[in-house]
Amino acid sequence: MPPGLTLDALPAPLPVIVNPHGGPWSRDNWGFSSEVQFLCSRGYAVFQLNFRGSTGYGRDFLEKSYKQWGLTMQNDITDGVHWLIDSGIADPKRIAIYGASYGGYATLAGACFTPELYCCAIDYVGVSNLLTFLQTIPPYWRAMLDMMYEQIGHPDRDRAQLEATSPALHADAIRCPLFIAQGANDPRVNKDESDQMVAALRLRGVEVEYMVKDNEGHGFANQENVFDFYRAVERFLQQHL
C-alpha cells in the first residue's frame, strides 16, 4: 500500500500494479521487498498473489499448473484483479501489470488475453512465444526437458495450445502501451523472445518502449543498469498509470 494508507480506510480506489511472480514454480512470501516499496512510495498499491503452481501449498496445487500457462494460471490472476475492483481497492481504469521471467509472460498474457483490464504493462525478461522458448532453453536445462514438456507442453503434441497461449502470436489483441526490458546475454529467456514481441507490437502500431542491456543476462545485476531500469519504470508508470 502507498504510505499512510490501509485497506480499511481508503479515501478512493487506488492505482494498482499487479505483480505476478516468476518461476512460475516459486512463490511470493511475507517480508520486505525493496522493489515493492519503491512502487508503493510512488503512490501505487502492489498486488502479489500465489496463483496455482506456486510452491508451498502442496503437490496437488502445484500440479494444477501443468500445461496451464496462459489458461487457468492466468485466470487466477484475472480473478484476483476482479476481486480488487469489486472490493473497491483498485481503480478499474488505473491497473497496470508488471512481472519478470514467468511474471513477464503473465504480464504479456494479461495484456493480450484480457486487454480490457490493464492500462499499461511492463515485461521484464519474459517469455513471449512458448514454442521458441522450449527450443532455446540453456544446455543446463536439457536434462529437464521431458519434465518441462509435462509442465508447459510438448511442441508437437500440444502445439495448438502452445500457439494459442503465446502472446507474440496474438499481439494484435494488445491495446495498452508496454515497456519491455531484456538482457542481451540471457541464457534462460533468449533475447529473441523480447525481440519477437517488440516486432509484433510495432508492426501493429502499439506503443512499446524497449530497453536492452548488452552486459546483462536473466535480470539486471549491474547497478547502473538497475538504476536505468527503475528510472524507466518510474517514468513509464507516471505517464500511463
Feature names for model-found ranges:
Residues 1-12, 166-168:
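Short beta-strand-to-loop junctions in surface cap/lid or active-site-entrance loops
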Residues 6-7, 26, 187:
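Short beta-strands and strand-coil junctions in structured, solvent-facing domains, enriched
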Residues 9-22:
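Short beta-strand element of the alpha/beta-hydrolase
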Residues 11-13, 33, 42, 174-175:
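Short loop/turn elements that form and flank the Walker-type P-loop nucleotide-binding site
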Residues 15-16, 45, 120:
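Short, Asp-centered acidic motifs that coordinate Mg2+ and/or phosphate
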Residues 19, 26-29:
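Conserved HGGG/HGGXW glycine-rich cap/lid loop of the alpha/beta-hydrolase fold
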Residues 30-49:
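Short amphipathic alpha-helix adjacent to the substrate-entry channel of hydrolases
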Residues 35, 48-241:
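Active-site-proximal cap/loop segments of hydrolase catalytic domains
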